[in-house]
């Protein structure tokens, strides 16, 4: 690293009225460095970066570029300093071409005429440098999210940016797209660019970052070099308590009777003769690689997918579940893995989202009982500690953690016998994860049978009483404590023990 930092933010404070969002924050970034910025939602990460990008002005503090004070009062000042910020929500015009987006606001012209051919040529040169597959003449609306992200990066390169800020860039990307993005980020770093990478995903931070800085409650907590990265220390820095305290699972919860019994359930495609059981008060983990059939199994149980064979029993009673409505009537709740596309009604109020699954139950002659709906939503908001100013706030405006708790509260409201959670903490920060784990443990204590699908192995190990592992549509094995380890789960998930897999169905 160079001795003189490319960027220094010193003693940055920012107040919104009486609320102080940042309290004397420091941040130092060098050329050729990937600098991760971590912290819970509300820690001040986005506010700090918006100050750097000129979207906000500081209340006090100073910014230095290569050791020289630099006044950033607006976006133009940031661009002149070589700073570009890629927001989580893309800042592109979908009806314009890639080239038109790259040059938007700075179009090439000669004699009053826009030089479109030259703009396309220059844009294509940047696209080729990135190794992207789209063309400069393509409309942005026809590109994937990953490609739109590349357009944002291309725009930063076109502007000769030296500092690139990326806010949760993998939130909407597939595993393959994420891998390609990482390759590009590493290449840009090797070319000398400084990259500030905002993320709550530790796996990404471990893979990419040269250094990590942590904010908590609007204050700078500290930084760790790559060689010193430690999950326990990062969690402690972010939430003020060690990783061992993150999981709230109580091992001494007495298990009740057999609540859910699945026998040889099949859909003829993704799920092949799966058998599993969950008892009242038990949290059972369902692990496996992407494409193993875990989500499809959950959809079969909830009636989203049609089963071609096998049986489902609840409390010893055989059932045929044709639809989610029937599943809800039988006391099954299902938290989907994609809350924005498959779970939440983003434009509706928090109250409407909470009571969505109880409308039929609580309606009187087809009319909504608004007083009862308000009571249900208020109780859920208090019980799950959902941070909203009031029950009528729009769901789409909430943080990821509060959106997830909002969805969980929908199923808490039906007083479920069985709760299926598909990636319950995906896209939420460490603090929200801890609260979700607390909610899960509380529901288990109340006798709910919980089937938890998760790709986060520490979560599976920390929260599960037992674990089933799927491989290529089948159960590859079942693990009990103390054999529930990440190594054993991955061995089963990758099919290494396929010839010696354990018998997991109990007659």
From Swiss-Prot:
This one is known as Ribose import ATP-binding protein RbsA
- Quote the catalytic activity from the record: D-ribose(out) + ATP + H2O = D-ribose(in) + ADP + phosphate + H(+)
Q: How does it sit in the membrane?
A: Peripheral membrane protein
Q: Which Pfam families match?
A: ABC_tran
Q: Could you tell me where this protein is found in the cell?
A: Cell inner membrane
Protein family according to the UniProt entry: Belongs to the ABC transporter superfamily. Ribose importer (TC 3.A.1.2.1) family.
Q: Which residues form the ABC transporter domain?
A: 7-242, 253-497
- Kindly give the CDD domains that the UniProt entry links to this protein: ABC_Carb_Monos_I, ABC_Carb_Monos_II
Q: Name one GO cellular component term.
A: plasma membrane
Look up the signal peptide feature and give its range: none
What Gene Ontology molecular function terms does this protein carry?
ABC-type D-ribose transporter activity; ATP binding; ATP hydrolysis activity
Organism in which the protein naturally occurs: Yersinia pestis
Q: Assembly state and interactors?
A: The complex is composed of an ATP-binding protein (RbsA), two transmembrane proteins (RbsC) and a solute-binding protein (RbsB).
Q: Does the keyword Nucleotide-binding apply?
A: yes
Q: What does this protein do?
A: Part of the ABC transporter complex RbsABC involved in ribose import. Responsible for energy coupling to the transport system.
Q: What is its EC number?
A: 7.5.2.7
């Amino acid at each position: 690293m160079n001795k003189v930092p490319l960027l220094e933010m010193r003693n940055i404070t920012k107040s919104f009225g009486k609320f102080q969002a940042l309290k004397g924050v420091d941040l130092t970034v060098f050329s050729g460095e990937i600098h991760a910025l971590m912290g819970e939602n509300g820690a001040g990460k986005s506010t700090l970066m918006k100050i750097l990008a000129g979207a906000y002005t500081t209340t006090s503090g100073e910014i230095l570029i290569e050791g020289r004070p630099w006044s950033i009062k607006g976006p133009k000042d940031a661009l002149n300093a070589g700073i570009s910020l890629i927001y989580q929500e893309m800042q592109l015009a979908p009806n314009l071409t890639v080239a038109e987006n790259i040059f938007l606001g700075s179009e090439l012209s000669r004699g009053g005429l826009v030089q479109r051919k030259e703009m396309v040529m220059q844009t294509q040169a940047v696209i080729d440098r990135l190794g992207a597959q789209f063309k400069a003449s393509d409309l942005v609306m026809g590109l994937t999210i990953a490609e739109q992200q590349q357009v944002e990066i291309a725009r930063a390169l076109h502007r000769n940016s030296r500092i690139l800020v990326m806010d949760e860039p993998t939130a909407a990307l597939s595993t393959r797209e994420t891998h390609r993005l990482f390759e590009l980020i590493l290449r840009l770093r090797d070319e000398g660019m400084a990259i500030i990478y905002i993320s709550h995903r530790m796996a990404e931070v471990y893979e990419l970052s040269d250094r990590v800085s942590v904010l908590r409650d609007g204050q700078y907590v500290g930084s760790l070099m790559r060689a010193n990265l430690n999950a326990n220390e990062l969690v402690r820095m972010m939430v003020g308590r060690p990783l061992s305290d993150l999981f709230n699972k109580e091992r001494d919860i007495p298990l009740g009777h057999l609540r859910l019994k699945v026998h040889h359930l099949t859909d003829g495609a993704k799920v092949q003769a799966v058998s599993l059981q969950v008892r009242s008060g038990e949290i059972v983990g369902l692990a496996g690689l992407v494409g193993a059939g875990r989500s499809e199994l959950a959809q079969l149980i909830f009636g989203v997918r049609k089963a071609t064979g096998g049986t489902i029993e609840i409390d010893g009673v055989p059932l045929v579940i044709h639809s989610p409505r029937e599943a809800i009537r039988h006391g099954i709740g299902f938290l989907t893995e994609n809350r924005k596309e498959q779970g939440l009604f983003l434009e509706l109020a928090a109250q409407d989202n909470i009571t969505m699954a109880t409308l039929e139950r609580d309606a009187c002659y087809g009319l909504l009982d608004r007083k009862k709906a308000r009571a249900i939503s208020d109780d859920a908001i208090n019980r799950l500690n959902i941070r909203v100013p009031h029950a009528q706030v729009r769901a789409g405006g909430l943080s990821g953690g509060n959106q997830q708790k909002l969805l969980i509260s929908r199923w808490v409201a039906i007083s479920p016998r069985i709760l299926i959670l598909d990636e319950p903490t995906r896209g939420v920060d460490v603090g929200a994860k801890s609260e979700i784990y607390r909610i899960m443990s509380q529901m288990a204590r109340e006798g709910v049978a919980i089937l938890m699908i998760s790709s986060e192995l520490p979560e599976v190990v920390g929260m599960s009483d037992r674990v089933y592992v799927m491989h290529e549509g089948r159960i590859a094995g079942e693990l009990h404590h103390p054999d529930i380890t990440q190594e054993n789960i991955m061995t089963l998930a990758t099919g290494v023990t396929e010839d010696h897999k354990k018998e997991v169905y109990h007659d």
